[in-house]
Amino acid sequence: VDTSEDTMGFDNIIALIKSQASPKAVAGMMKFGINTTNTYGVSIPALRAIAKKFRKRNHVIAQELWSSGIHEARLLASMIDDPNLVTEKQMEKWVNDFNSWDICDKCCSNLFDKTKYAYKKAIQWSTRNEEYVKRAGFVLSGGIGSS
């Protein structure tokens, strides 16, 4: 798989994720209560290495990655999306897509806490009933204070 930035389109990124699949890691993720539906078991350091190949953030590819529903693609989307282009609508869509604590926490700390809506969403979400939406509110609250 060619991994230069010029060829890091959606298909190549997904192929790269799949090439690093680790069934053993997936089994380990289950032990930590991570939802392993549509998961390949690629480590966070490996995903960060892919993200570093982008010299600047890429909102368009981030949207494609998120829409794939692949666990690691969603984590990567949170690493490469441009917080200046993230809308409240996108944040609401993504927070309602959260199906695991790690996606929630990483998306909030990689992306949402860098948006202009972070404070507003921290307040709104912390009063909601949905498990991962409420968690996102609390994760954002913690992130805002430390950034």
Can you name each region flagged by the protein language model?
Residues 2-147:
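Alpha-helical scaffold domains
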